[in-house]
Every structure is written in structure tokens, then in C-alpha cells.
């Protein structure tokens, strides 16, 4: 399963072609795997560069990178594309060294080992956002579930359904409200551990957009383990077309529940099909998105959650949060906080829901409901 997700993260086909959403053709579409946008359509016209330069003559560069325990692809277009790709790769590697729980000398591993520590600016920014999301989502996003993820084997690959008493004991120690943060210093409660993996790739892609600005690129796109973020438009001035993997056909990497067209946006998806194991004794499937309130895989009635935002870190954190919260709570959350993001959801009945500002940029062969401030239609 891990290998399949890695392959999907590399599936970037950037030529401009037509596609019927839900079909098996992936031509012209960036695959988003579970991994406000309403103004993106304004960028659909030609860019100043594309008016005067043949798009096929614009220099390009790309790199495939393994970091944060996943495969990543960076593709840049512009005169300084090679420099931008090199700078992006260096930034990815720097943040991987800082944040990876798989590296004993990373900052996060040190904090978990010592129970406290001084945070770098990057870590402090992510922890601050994680605590905000913990508060606004009612605990659906919680960086302190790391010991539970470890207990289930999702951090080691040694999968097992945990003993109920052991799980209950660990669950009692979880809760971001038990963390103490004072300026750049963090202190964990007894038995706690943190993992920023739920927002780290989104934070990273956001940083890459800032790097691309420095190199005055015509356009760029990154896929960090299936988390996609686009810089500006394609070289011909058209929008990037992102195909959201169909959770009802996860084995087929080019089957989409729909296609969303964006510029200068992150498109990040969470789904139960990403990482899971089957218990040999019972035949039951357990996925990796844990409900922080129960310690068990979330059962929210959703199969897939995609968040579209200019803020990669926000999109990353909310894709997980909304999966845990379910349809109704996610819709209400968007109504209260949705100035900076939009949602595309699929429920277990195979019906798709999209927030109103994004509806004009999203196409699907599935039945689509629109989430508005007034309700769901």
C-alpha cells in the first residue's frame, strides 16, 4: 500500500488535454491522493509571460525527492527553474531533518525524548497552528496522538490491533490542551509525544511557494506525497487541473472522483485508503486516521476529504480534521471559518459535496451537492 501511495505522488502529467472526471484517463491532470479558492478562476486567462513567449520554449526543471517518509516531485518553469528546484530540494531536506520522527537527532525526536525543549521558528509556527486547529476543531486535530499511532504500528509498519486497556491508558495522556507552550519553549505532559506530520508537508509546500517567488518563475507545481500545491498558472496561462483520487477505486491511480482547477492553491486530500492494514484474525480493515477522542480509526461516514486553500499548512491540517469530524461538522466548520479554504468531500454512499465558492471550478461524474451558508443542496 505504501508503494502505491508513493507511485501516485509521482503522477504529474502537465500537458493541457481534456478529461472526463471519473474516467480512467489522467492526461493533463495532477493526481491528488490522500495526501477561499473561489477566486482562483480569475487566473484562468493568459499570463503576461504567455502573451509574449511560446510556452513550449519556457525552460523547465524537475526533481524527484524522498523525504518525510514519502516520494515528492518538484517541477518549475522559468529562466531560473533549475536554481529554484535546487533551492526547493534543499528546503525539503532541511525541514525533513528538523521534523522527522524517524530521525533520532531531529528537533521533534529530541523534544519527545527530553519531554521539553526550545523550538525553532519553523517548529513554533507549526505548533502554534496545531494548537489553534485543536481548539477550533474541538480536538479533531491533535499532534499528541503520536503514541497512539505508534501503538497501532502506523509509525513502524508493525501493525496490530492494540489491547483495549493499553490504548485507554495512552489515550488518557493525549490532548494538546496538556501541552505547555511559553514563547519558543514547549513542555509535554507525562507520557506524551508529538508528531507534526499532519501539517508538515503542507507547511513545507507553503515554504516552497515563497522560494518560487524569489526566482520569478512562470509557474510551478509540487507533489509532496500526494499533497499538491501550485504556484501561479501553467505556462500557457491556464489553470492547473487537479484530479482527486477516487476512494472507491483506490487501486486505479487515474480514476478520479472529480477534477478541480486552481492557481496559487494547495489541494490536499485525506482518505482511509491511504494507509491501512487488515487484521488477520477478524478480517477487519483499520486505517491510519485516528479519532483523538477514541484512539480508534475515525468512523465519520466520509471516504475522502480534500481541502483547497492558499495556505498549505491549513489545508493539510484541515484535511485530517474534517475527515474525523464528518460531513455535517465539516460543513459547519467551513461556514464559521471558511474564508481561507474550501472543501470537497465524498461520503460512504459515493455522493460528493463541494463548498459553494469552489463549485464553479469543480467537475465530477458523481452526484454533487453544494454546501452553502444556508445549508446543503
PLM segments and residue spans:
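Mature catalytic core of soluble alpha/beta enzymes
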Residues: 2-377
